[in-house]
Curated annotation (Swiss-Prot):
This is tRNA 2-selenouridine synthase. Transmembrane segments: none annotated. SUPFAM superfamilies: Rhodanese/Cell cycle control phosphatase. Residues 14-137 form the Rhodanese domain. Its EC number is 2.9.1.3. It comes from Aeromonas salmonicida (strain A449). Monomer. It catalyses: 5-methylaminomethyl-2-thiouridine(34) in tRNA + selenophosphate + (2E)-geranyl diphosphate + H2O + H(+) = 5-methylaminomethyl-2-selenouridine(34) in tRNA + (2E)-thiogeraniol + phosphate + diphosphate; 5-methylaminomethyl-2-thiouridine(34) in tRNA + (2E)-geranyl diphosphate = 5-methylaminomethyl-S-(2E)-geranyl-thiouridine(34) in tRNA + diphosphate; 5-methylaminomethyl-S-(2E)-geranyl-thiouridine(34) in tRNA + selenophosphate + H(+) = 5-methylaminomethyl-2-(Se-phospho)selenouridine(34) in tRNA + (2E)-thiogeraniol; 5-methylaminomethyl-2-(Se-phospho)selenouridine(34) in tRNA + H2O = 5-methylaminomethyl-2-selenouridine(34) in tRNA + phosphate.
Amino acid sequence: MSQLPLTSDLARIFLDDVPLIDLRAPIEFKEGAFPCSTSLPLMTDDERAQVGTCFKQRGQAAAIELGHQLVGGAVRAERLDGWLAQLRKQPDALLYCFRGGLRSQTVQLWLHEAGVTRPRVAGGYKEMRRFLIDTLDKAAAECHWTVLTGMTGSGKTHMLEHVTQAVDLEGHAHHRGSSFGQLPGGQPSNINFENKLAIELLKRRHQGEHAFVVEDESRLIGRCCLPNPLFDAMCEAPLVVVDVPQSERAEQIRQDYVHDLWLRYQAMFGAEEGWPLFAAYLTDALARLKRRLGDQAHRELDQLMQIALAEQANSGTTERHLAWITLLLTRYYDPMYLYQLGNKRERIVFRGEKQACLDFFAEQHAARQQG
């Protein structure tokens, strides 16, 4: 078994999107894995738990023996068929378990005996995860970061689509970063969020990029937490402020969080099932702000929202939503933003309308390319 191939070129695995077969238990895969990995576990969650208990009570030899009993005979044959089928689809796939130990060694040997020899990843999941954490830490420390900020509804996410050096943190988190930021389909685990972000930065730095623009975010984007080194770098980074009138921002919010999001719910769940989910999404998002708004303001906003939802349900129009959106900006989001910006004015390097900010980013990018 010791003569079967190992690979430790972790950078190449992620730069080339090498397919991976994850041999850990399903519960381990759910907590975090890698974008190009497929879960084909050696043991189920229950089998793994039994082996773990045996190890604690009777030691390693007994645990290994139990593992072979649980995954033997027809069970072994069935799982071997699954690994072989996957390797027929992805013949260059690599094998890994948690530490690159017995589980991946066992499967590698069984595959070898079946006539297929594939490398396993030295150090397994733990080593690959450490590599990606280090990648994030180095990017935070070594790259030049600029933060795009602006009042709620300024369309910052849309602006970044036109910025060459942009990194879409909210895209990786599958969340728009506010009380109303939840998207249908849920969020990735925090580990998966970090892994995808690290792989993007690894690839882009490998191509020679070292300056990035991100949207102003709190530490939490929904349930996804920004890595401490990256968040710290963002808190010290130069700021570009985009100025957009409130009426335009209210319209942008109506478009993004009402019109477009309803279409996403409708596409995912159908109109009949999707409507109550969409209405609950808006109502619940506002309810999460109740403590900060106060009871009276929350009641007023909720009444306006329910009127708008009723009209949307009856006629399909969404213009009534502008009433509660504008009031929420006036009462909550705009004052909060102005207070926060007042604490970091010394970091502002540019301020202007959307196109002026986009031109600034383009000029910065061109200057770095020439330099």
